[in-house]
């Protein structure tokens, strides 16, 4: 790192902290992305295999990974892990199947639907993460959670959740399922989450379209505490327009009682 400028050294240190990668990987990724830290971290998380210089895949024991898959595979269909296998997988990881950590693993595996992994999803996902054991996967979980601190990666994770959660063949996401997943992924990120859920249960009572799901993330990150910055003429879904109309008097009422 001696040949680098001080500003570049700072970026290398930040990159290493953020991605939990080595100095060699940090220098390689930053130099390929014009030393733009945000671009480099985003590209690293999207395609880690292009930048990781340590031979993660080379040190992977394929036979061990196959044996691990065999532990979880569906007895009736050897090409997938069914609900019982998922439960065993979660037990081995000491994780609640309904936890956000399990959802993050499903995202990293690019799983198509909840409560199962195809053999390809499991094998490719574990390989990409450089894991051939439950212990190695456990050690990766904090890094995956760290990855979600980058807004672009969280958005990818959030949008993945809609397709993962809905029933195959359905366009929308059932309301109860949508609320359950919103409580999981937007907890601590959307100040009006409880009010949003109340509004949906009282006034909507229908499935949630993909467009509404995706735009709620944008809404949650821009809306002011009193909703005064909401643009009714903007390209927001009608459901969000209706929510703002429902919520504003309640927010104003809460403020007047606390003053």
From Swiss-Prot:
Q: Where in the cell is it found?
A: Nucleus; Cytoplasm
- Where N-acetylmethionine occurs along the chain? 1
What's in the keyword line of the UniProt record? Answer: Acetylation, Cytoplasm, Nucleus, Proto-oncogene, Ubl conjugation, Ubl conjugation pathway
Main localization of the protein described in the UniProt heading: nucleus
Residues in domain DCUN1? 60-248
- According to UniProt, residues marked as the site described as Essential for interaction with UBE2M are 115
Q: Where is the UBA-like domain?
A: 8-45
Q: What happens when the gene is disrupted?
A: Reduced neddylation of Cul3 in lysates from testis.
What Pfam families does this protein map onto?
Cullin_binding, UBA_4
Secretion signal, residue range per the UniProt entry? none
Q: Name one GO cellular component term.
A: cytoplasm
**Biological process (GO), any one:** positive regulation of protein neddylation
Q: Which GO terms describe its molecular function?
A: cullin family protein binding
- List the expressing tissues: Highly expressed in testis. Also expressed in brain, heart, liver, skeletal muscle and kidney. In brain, preferentially expressed in the telencephalon ventricular and subventricular zones, albeit at low levels. In adult testis, expressed in cells above seminiferous tubules, but only weakly in spermatogonia.
- Summarize what the UniProt record says about post-translational modification: Mono- and poly-ubiquitinated by ARIH2 and ARIH1. Monoubiquitination by ARIH2 is mediated by an interaction between autoubiquitinated ARIH2 and the UBA-like domain. The monoubiquitinated form preferentially interacts with non-neddylated cullins and modulates cullin RING ligase (CRL) complex composition and activity.
The coiled-coil segments of this chain are: none
Sequence intervals crossing the membrane: none
Which InterPro entries does the record match to this protein? DCN-prot, DCN1-like_PONY, PONY_dom, UBA-like_sf
Upon changing residue 241 to N, the result is: Loss of neddylation activity towards Cul3
**Subunit structure as annotated in this protein's UniProt entry:** Part of an E3 complex for neddylation composed of cullins, RBX1, UBE2M and CAND1. Interacts (via the DCUN1 domain) with the unneddylated cullins: interacts with CUL1, CUL2, CUL3, CUL4A, CUL4B and CUL5; these interactions promote the cullin neddylation and the identity of the cullin dictates the affinity of the interaction. Binds neddylated CUL1. Interacts (via the C-terminus 50 AA) directly with RBX1. Interacts (via DCUN1 domain) with the N-terminally acetylated form of UBE2M and UBE2F. Interacts preferentially with UBE2M-NEDD8 thioester (via N-terminus 1-26 AA) than with free UBE2M.
Instruction: Sum up the protein's function in the record's words.
Output: Part of an E3 ubiquitin ligase complex for neddylation. Promotes neddylation of cullin components of E3 cullin-RING ubiquitin ligase complexes. Acts by binding to cullin-RBX1 complexes in the cytoplasm and promoting their nuclear translocation, enhancing recruitment of E2-NEDD8 (UBE2M-NEDD8) thioester to the complex, and optimizing the orientation of proteins in the complex to allow efficient transfer of NEDD8 from the E2 to the cullin substrates. Involved in the release of inhibitory effets of CAND1 on cullin-RING ligase E3 complex assembly and activity.
Task: Supply the domain comment.
Answer: The DCUN1 domain, also known as PONY domain, mediates the interaction with different cullins. The DCUN1 domain mediates the interaction with the N-terminally acetylated NEDD8-conjugating E2s enzyme leading to the NEDD8 transfer from N-terminally acetylated NEDD8-conjugating E2s enzyme to different cullin C-terminal domain-RBX complexes; the neddylation efficiency correlates with the DCUN1D1-cullin and DCUN1D1-E2 interaction affinities. The UBA-like domain mediates interaction with autoubiquitylated ARIH2 leading to ubiquitin ligation to DCUN1D1.
Protein name (database record)? DCN1-like protein 1
Say which species the protein is native to: Mus musculus
Give the gene that encodes this protein.
Dcun1d1
């Amino acid at each position: 790192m001696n040949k680098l400028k001080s500003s570049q050294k700072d970026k290398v240190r930040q990159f290493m902290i953020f991605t939990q990668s080595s100095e060699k990987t940090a220098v390689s990724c930053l130099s390929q992305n014009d030393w733009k830290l945000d671009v480099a971290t985003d590209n690293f998380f999207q395609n880690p295999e292009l930048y990781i210089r340590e031979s993660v895949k080379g040190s992977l024991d394929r036979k061990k990974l196959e044996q691990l898959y065999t532990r979880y595979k569906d007895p009736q269909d050897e090409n997938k892990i069914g609900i019982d296998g998922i439960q065993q997988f979660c037990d081995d990881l000491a994780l609640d199947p309904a936890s956000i950590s399990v959802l993050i693993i499903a995202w990293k595996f690019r799983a198509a639907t909840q409560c199962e992994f195809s053999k390809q999803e499991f094998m490719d996902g574990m390989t990409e993460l450089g894991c051939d054991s439950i212990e190695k996967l456990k050690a990766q979980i904090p890094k995956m959670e760290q990855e979600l601190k980058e807004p672009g990666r969280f958005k990818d994770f959030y949008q993945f959740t809609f397709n993962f959660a809905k029933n195959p063949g359905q366009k929308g996401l059932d309301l109860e399922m949508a609320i359950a997943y919103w409580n999981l992924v937007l907890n601590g990120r959307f100040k009006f989450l409880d009010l949003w859920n109340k509004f949906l249960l009282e006034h909507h009572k229908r499935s949630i379209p993909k467009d509404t799901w995706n735009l709620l993330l944008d809404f949650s990150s821009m809306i002011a505490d009193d909703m005064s910055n909401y643009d009714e003429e903007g390209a927001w879904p009608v459901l969000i327009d209706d929510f703002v109309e429902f919520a504003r008097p309640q927010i104003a009422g809460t403020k007047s009682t606390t003053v």
